[in-house]
Amino acid sequence: MAHQFPALTSEQKKALSETARRIVANGKGILAADESVGTMGNRLQRIKVENTEENRRQFRELLFTVDSSVSQSIGGVILFHETLYQKDGQGKLFRDILKEKGIVVGIKLDQGVAPLAGTNKETTVQGLDGLSERCAQYKKDGADFGKWRAVLKIDNQCPSHLAIQENANTLARYASICQQNGLVPIVEPEVIPDGSHDMEHCQYVTEKVLAAVYKALNDHHVYLEGTLLKPNMVTAGHACTKKYTPEQVAMATVTALHRTVPAAVPGICFLSGGMSEEDATLNLNAINLCPLPKPWKLSFSYGRALQASALAAWGGKAENKKTTQEAFMKRALANSQAAKGQYVHMGSSGSASTQSLFTASYTY
């Protein structure tokens, strides 16, 4: 017999629910700026800029110091540990700059993946040890939500039952610990787009993964109204020769969500998964126009798909500040419109925005 021992007080629930709803209110989404030092190095290398702490700080300062109107498009920003404690040129903490704009500050909490022995190179997530203490410290230091990314792949015998169950339980344990410490957990079970599988196969796997995740969240007494989901869109594998329209992606994606994600979840913020900036926006717009019941806000939590044009415009040069910030604002506004189903594609948007951002076996 299941006995109920309250996991959260009504005050804790109210605070978590309000924060989650605030992040995705009125077409707002999330800027994922939580790339690790190594991942940021790969980005900077492409524009021939050295991967130093100062260069990483300078680029992120450009993103965070844009006009305050960005808060109409961006409801939350996910930071990496380093960035939470960095300051702008005037000595002001980035987290304070964001909060003054009304943007909720989040923090990456997972510590990468580790191999699952006995599987076909599948992984689980590290970072549960000491997580409660880290959450408490981050909350004290201004963070109000967390992010934890689990990775599942479609391949021969993958994802295995073990990988699905292990990652679902780890996500649920993380979510529970977050909520105990006053952080809204972003639950990210990513079915990565590596492979040649078709969209229908991805839909089948995504449904199995999400069903397991919500069973685990229920088992761990996670308060769904105080969470957000960050899933992949349902797309074909990157090497699949068959191409699908945004409308087909939208129908498959919303169908999968409709079958697996409880209506209590306030928002679903899609990851961009290496899509070009423009494709990520077009797919999100089609998802919001999909003629199926959609009880949740359907928004974005994009990293590369919000930053690629801005990074290309910057090129490591301080004099490119204006064009860099304009490029970022343009993508933020486009995705906010898409989150309301109001984006209008205006033909070519420039080479950076239509370039695929796919990286095989992508790690943050």
Swiss-Prot record:
Gene3D superfamilies linked to this entry: Aldolase class I
Compartment annotation: Cytoplasm, Cytosol; Cytoplasm, Cytoskeleton, Microtubule organizing center, Centrosome, Centriolar satellite
Biological process annotations from GO: fructose 1,6-bisphosphate metabolic process; fructose metabolic process; gluconeogenesis; glycolytic process
Residues modified to N6-succinyllysine: 13, 121, 317
Pathway noted in the entry: Carbohydrate degradation; glycolysis; D-glyceraldehyde 3-phosphate and glycerone phosphate from D-glucose: step 4/4; Carbohydrate biosynthesis; gluconeogenesis; Carbohydrate metabolism; fructose metabolism
Note: In vertebrates, 3 forms of this ubiquitous glycolytic enzyme are found, aldolase A in muscle, aldolase B in liver and aldolase C in brain.
Cellular component GO terms, alphabetical: centriolar satellite; cytosol
Name of the protein described by the UniProt record: Fructose-bisphosphate aldolase B
Organism placement in taxonomy: Eukaryota, Metazoa, Chordata, Craniata, Vertebrata
Residues engaged in binding beta-D-fructose 1,6-bisphosphate: 43, 272-274, 304
Catalyzed reactions per annotation: beta-D-fructose 1,6-bisphosphate = D-glyceraldehyde 3-phosphate + dihydroxyacetone phosphate; beta-D-fructose 1-phosphate = D-glyceraldehyde + dihydroxyacetone phosphate
One Pfam family, short name: Glycolytic
InterPro entries per UniProt: Aldolase_I_AS (IPR029768), Aldolase_TIM (IPR013785), FBA_I (IPR000741)
Superkingdom assignment: Eukaryota
Self-association and partners: Homotetramer. Interacts with BBS1, BBS2, BBS4 and BBS7. Forms a ternary complex with G6PD and TP53; this interaction is direct.
Catalytic residues in the record: 188 (proton acceptor), 230 (schiff-base intermediate with dihydroxyacetone-p)
Naturally occurring in which organism (per UniProt): Bos taurus
Enzyme class: lyase
EC assignment: 4.1.2.13
Site feature location: Necessary for preference for fructose 1,6-bisphosphate over fructose 1-phosphate: 364
Similarity field: Belongs to the class I fructose-bisphosphate aldolase family.
KW Acetylation (keyword) present: yes
Phosphoserine PTM positions: 36, 132, 272, 276, 299, 301, 309
Modified residues (Phosphothreonine): 39, 119
Modified-residue entries (N-acetylalanine), positions: 2
Gene Ontology MF: a single term: fructose-bisphosphate aldolase activity
